């Protein structure tokens, strides 16, 4: 499974959204209905899945599906 597929699966699992809703440009809060707690849990799930540490100032920038994919790809 590619990084993109793994990130999208985490988003589907964490936010309880349909896979087809998880488009690259989708915003977690505006498009996928996440709240601030959801985004914190999403970052924690990404850290666990990819065994990376995401500093708070970086986590704040991860607001869309593509930004999550890009962050993981650049920090693995």
Curated annotation (Swiss-Prot):
InterPro entries recorded: ACP, ACP-like_sf, PP-bd_ACP, Ppantetheine_attach_site
GO BP, sorted A to Z: lipid A biosynthetic process
Keyword field: Cytoplasm, Fatty acid biosynthesis, Fatty acid metabolism, Lipid biosynthesis, Lipid metabolism, Phosphopantetheine, Phosphoprotein
GO CC annotation: cytosol; membrane
Superkingdom field: Bacteria
One Pfam family cited in the UniProt record for this chain: PP-binding
Pathway terms, separated by semicolons: Lipid metabolism; fatty acid biosynthesis
Post-translational modification note: 4'-phosphopantetheine is transferred from CoA to a specific serine of apo-ACP by AcpS. This modification is essential for activity because fatty acids are bound in thioester linkage to the sulfhydryl of the prosthetic group.
Gene Ontology MF terms in the entry: acyl binding; acyl carrier activity
Subcellular location: Cytoplasm
Main location: cytoplasm
Domain Carrier, chain residue ranges per copy: 1-76
Residues annotated with O-(pantetheine 4'-phosphoryl)serine modification: 36
Family per similarity comment: Belongs to the acyl carrier protein (ACP) family.
Purpose of the protein: Carrier of the growing fatty acid chain in fatty acid biosynthesis.
Protein name: Acyl carrier protein
Species annotation: Mannheimia succiniciproducens (strain KCTC 0769BP / MBEL55E)
């Amino acid at each position: 499974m590619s990084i993109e597929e793994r990130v999208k699966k985490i988003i589907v699992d964490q936010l309880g959204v349909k896979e087809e809703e998880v488009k690259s440009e989708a915003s977690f809060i505006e498009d996928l209905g996440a709240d601030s707690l959801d985004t914190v849990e999403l970052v924690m799930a990404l850290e666990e899945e990819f065994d990376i540490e995401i500093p708070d100032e970086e986590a704040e920038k991860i607001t869309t599906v593509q930004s999550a994919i890009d962050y993981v790809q650049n920090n693995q």
